[in-house]
């Protein structure tokens, strides 16, 4: 074969050509990668803020890091010019050009965070911060700056934070099931609804709130409601402790319905059945028989009532108390009324900001009460109702509408939202209620009302074993299931009385809320078992 002419390129096989093509493509990619790395390095070099923003990633306790955080509520003009760390949720974000503004929320408190592009705040940092989804939790290192004009959209109106560093602690999904601003908005009045104004802002309905309760609980109003509710429990405990009461813990799984009725949840209990307690009633009394003299308990109670109303739930928190007395059950009734009025005063003195916050979204007349509390006898209440057009029998129980109407009449006549109704008909009270000594139609029992709705039911209890058996039989209570309760009165028991208060109902009525579910963290009713 003749040699190739001088200067001519040797012919390559198809295999060799493909190999060269692959090498060229590989070299091209390597060049692109190198160029990209150089470009990224250049961008990093340009980003003067690269170490001052980003995400912590998953905080799984891999290191102990100490940062001294300042609470949002503590940010004020007295701290102006100080550099501080603050942790909170991103409530709102707005950015334009070289500026970015956040509202940082921590509980019920909010503060504005401002960022301006400069030699320390890069364009990349502004872009990153403005892209953080609402409700994400962030750490901000910033200088507290006094502002010339009040920031009306925040609780901290006289200051803002000039951010230097921003790090994401926990990211929220970008699409929220409801907006905090919408959930915080006051519901329109009837007049506003009737006007059919265009461009009305969205208002979140109750079911949507409860379906997405975790988000709804973040609103300032929800925080205020449950701070007040915690205050009710705290004051109830403190007032009774000072008066010599002992807190007890009563069982919630019991052998027989505690109220002697049918509205109970029956549960399997090994080879038999048990019930969820409708109240701690029997065990409060047994504690009195055990010479505790004055007791109280706070805990859940259960009612299997198929009532889908604004004031009923199947599970709620009971504030219950029981007390031995010397000669007359009014010793106890008046004590309970005094405890409640003392509690109302404490709430109005110590929770003014929270009461105002709730009132902004759910306007209501301030709660009124008098001292000493008004005590109205049942026959007198019946007379008052009849004088105002209500047809009702002497021994009839009060329906919910009649209770409301009576509350309205009492408010007009006595200028109080709180009163005691004494001497209920015996036929409408539980089996353990002591009959009236002078008129067998009535009983030594009482209810207490707020804004025309019952918040406490109480009475003198039967402390004689034989009489208790007689009344239990009358109410068709299975004696075998309450034998230990009956036996506790065979060995001598002081006369005693007490009552049970519904925590959520007191919260609702004190604040003038329209539905008890707003005063329950995760409410339970016949139609709701989740979340």
From Swiss-Prot:
Localization: Cytoplasm
One of the record's GO molecular function terms: RNA binding
Catalytic activity reported: tRNA(Asp) + L-aspartate + ATP = L-aspartyl-tRNA(Asp) + AMP + diphosphate
GO biological process, one term: aspartyl-tRNA aminoacylation
EC number, as in UniProt: 6.1.1.12
Keywords: Aminoacyl-tRNA synthetase, ATP-binding, Cytoplasm, Ligase, Nucleotide-binding, Protein biosynthesis
GO cellular component: aminoacyl-tRNA synthetase multienzyme complex; cytosol
Top-level enzyme category: ligase
Membrane spanning stretches: none
Binding site for L-aspartate: 259, 303, 457, 461
Bias (Basic and acidic residues) ranges: 8-32
Location of the region described as Aspartate in the Swiss-Prot/TrEMBL record: 281-284
Binding locations of ATP: 303-305, 311-313, 454, 502-505
Description of how the protein assembles with itself and partners: Homodimer.
PANTHER family assigned: ASPARTATE--TRNA LIGASE, CYTOPLASMIC (PTHR43450:SF1), ASPARTYL-TRNA SYNTHETASE (PTHR43450)
Similarity section: Belongs to the class-II aminoacyl-tRNA synthetase family. Type 2 subfamily.
Protein name, UniProt field: Aspartate--tRNA ligase, cytoplasmic
Organism: Caenorhabditis elegans
Source organism phylogeny: Eukaryota, Metazoa, Ecdysozoa, Nematoda, Chromadorea
